[in-house]
């Protein structure tokens, strides 16, 4: 399958992936509008992976990892970057073939390129999630993570959800043959050429400065406590509200990540904070599952 989009631009590559997975049958949803560390934290993955209701979603997700910032000086380390996420439940038997089809569409002939699936089981302690997985290496560079979810929020995933996560910047750097993410051609149209650096370099410099030097530590500690308290209250209601509670959990997790960037948390404290977030996520997962069960798992009736 070919595409009408120019995959030699970052923009065109994303549009091509959206087109490809839409044709497979995925619903293309929009990025989650809060700070998350990975596409997995989007509710369409983290919560929809629970319970028996089938799903098929694909989306771009901006991801923030404050400790990964390098003041815009490192050619491939960013505190804000993009993932393309595909989640299908139950995971189709041919999901690897579908993935390889997406690489072909981007111009990679599997007979001409070294494409390897390297076993790499995945775990997210704060989500209480883990899965069997593989890294996909393209000519020696990791470009994708494959995961078959086994648990989220400590609950078993039945049936198993298949997740494909593309590292968009890495994949684009390979396609375009550049050594610095800032040299990527983001778009190239009638109004001229725009690079990734044009769009994001100043943001990397300033956000790194904020994350490491100026984020208010006292405020972040208080914010964590407040978000934790709100999440607990929402889950303790007679009719719990798992979706708003989950948003509070994500806010708490981002506050923790910012404290980590500020080096405000010791190694032992760090583990305690992770366990606190994990406990909240477990509560959200149980409440979400119960809410769908109370509705009779309506997605199963389609």
Curated annotation (Swiss-Prot):
One of its GO terms (cellular component) is cytosol. Gene3D superfamilies: Bira Bifunctional Protein, Domain 2, Class II aaRS and biotin synthetases, domain 2. Pfam families: tRNA-synt_2e. Its EC number is 6.1.1.14. Keywords: Aminoacyl-tRNA synthetase, ATP-binding, Cytoplasm, Ligase, Nucleotide-binding, Protein biosynthesis. InterPro entries: aa-tRNA-synth_II/BPL/LPL, Gly-tRNA-synth_heterodimer, Gly-tRNA_ligase_asu. GO terms for molecular function: ATP binding; glycine-tRNA ligase activity. The keyword Protein biosynthesis applies. It is found in: Cytoplasm. It catalyses: tRNA(Gly) + glycine + ATP = glycyl-tRNA(Gly) + AMP + diphosphate. One of its GO terms (biological process) is glycyl-tRNA aminoacylation. Belongs to the class-II aminoacyl-tRNA synthetase family. Tetramer of two alpha and two beta subunits. HAMAP family: Gly_tRNA_synth_alpha. NCBIfam families: glyQ, PRK09348.1. PANTHER family: GLYCINE--TRNA LIGASE, CHLOROPLASTIC_MITOCHONDRIAL 2, GLYCYL-TRNA SYNTHETASE. This is Glycine--tRNA ligase alpha subunit.
């Amino acid at each position: 399958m070919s595409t009408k989009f120019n995959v030699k631009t970052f923009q065109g590559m994303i549009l091509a992936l959206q087109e490809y997975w839409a044709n497979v049958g995925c619903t293309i949803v929009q990025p989650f509008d809060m700070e998350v560390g990975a596409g997995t934290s989007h509710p369409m993955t983290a919560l929809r992976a629970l319970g028996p209701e089938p799903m098929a979603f694909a989306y771009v997700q901006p991801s923030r990892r404050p400790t990964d910032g390098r003041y815009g000086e490192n050619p491939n380390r960013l505190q804000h970057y993009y993932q393309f996420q595909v989640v299908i439940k139950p995971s189709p038997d041919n999901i690897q073939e579908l993935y390889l089809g997406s690489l072909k569409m981007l111009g990679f002939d599997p007979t001409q390129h070294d494409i390897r699936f390297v076993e790499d089981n995945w775990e997210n302690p704060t989500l209480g999630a883990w899965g069997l997985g593989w890294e996909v290496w393209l000519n020696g560079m990791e470009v994708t993570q494959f995961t078959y979810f086994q648990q989220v929020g400590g609950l078993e995933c039945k049936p198993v959800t298949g997740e494909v996560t593309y590292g968009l910047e890495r994949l684009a750097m390979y396609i375009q043959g550049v050594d610095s993410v800032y040299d990527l051609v983001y778009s190239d149209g009638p109004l001229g050429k725009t690079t990734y650096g044009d769009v994001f370099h100043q943001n990397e410099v300033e956000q790194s400065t904020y994350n490491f030097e100026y984020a208010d530590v006292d405020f972040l500690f208080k914010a964590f406590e407040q978000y934790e308290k709100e999440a607990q209250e929402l889950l303790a209601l007679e009719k719990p509200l798992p979706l708003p509670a989950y948003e509070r959990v994500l806010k708490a997790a981002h506050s923790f990540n910012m404290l980590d960037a500020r080096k405000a948390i010791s190694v032992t404290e760090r583990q305690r904070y992770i366990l606190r977030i994990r406990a909240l996520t477990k509560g959200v997962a149980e409440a979400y599952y119960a809410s769908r069960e109370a509705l009779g798992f309506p997605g199963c009736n389609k």
